[in-house]
């Protein structure tokens, strides 16, 4: 099948030249599959991307209803697109988590890279064995855009269930600034004290953001 002017459509281009040869607009068009009456699927793909300023991050963070509200998209296409984006996120996580020995704050930052793009604050507890290998993890809290609560009871319940010798607590700052707040420092001290009582060490508390990370261990605050 050819488009006007004899150029190959995205699916045919992928077959001939591979997915790397396609633009984001063409890849989205393949996921959408069809356009709407009077509008080619490539035009619909362009409209959709323009709605989110051409940013895959913004598109990925958008809700189903917001994506479906773009004229010609609808809920079925929105669901398909969100599923494709989620698969991409999970692939990224798998690639970043090899190896899973978290013996530096840089590795922790890479391990939790998907958190930096979230618009809501979440808290992740990563459970480690004595050699700092990951043996489990749990997302504890989904907070508002500017606040998240971390309770030692929840953190160490996760650790004890995993039979962990240590934990790394990670949370994101949607603002993009990883600088810890006064509350972040107080929570870190509470977690450290609770861990000492329970015999499960707080290996690190890392704040991640689009502009980098802050490690309490690296900064000598643990």
From Swiss-Prot:
Q: Where is the MPN domain?
A: 101-222
Instruction: Cite the GO molecular-function annotations of the record.
Output: metal ion binding; metallopeptidase activity
- Which SUPFAM superfamilies does the protein's record reference? JAB1/MPN domain, RuvA domain 2-like
Query: Does Transcription appear among the keywords?
Result: no
InterPro entries according to UniProt? MPN (IPR037518), RadC_JAB (IPR025657), RuvA_2-like (IPR010994), UPF0758 (IPR001405), UPF0758_CS (IPR020891), UPF0758_N (IPR046778)
- Summarize where Zn(2+) binds, as residue positions: 171, 173, 184
Pfam families per the UniProt record, alphabetical? RadC (PF04002), UPF0758_N (PF20582)
Per the Swiss-Prot or TrEMBL record, what residue ranges does the short sequence motif JAMM motif cover?
A: 171-184
**Keyword entries, A-Z:** Hydrolase, Metal-binding, Metalloprotease, Protease, Zinc
Q: Which CDD domains match?
A: MPN_DUF2466
Q: Name one GO biological process term.
A: proteolysis
Which positions form S-S bridges?
none
- Membership in a protein family: Belongs to the UPF0758 family.
Q: Identify the PANTHER family for this entry.
A: DNA REPAIR PROTEIN RADC, UPF0758 PROTEIN YEES-RELATED
Which protein are we looking at? UPF0758 protein Tpet_1235
Question: Lineage from the top down?
Answer: Bacteria, Thermotogati, Thermotogota, Thermotogae, Thermotogales
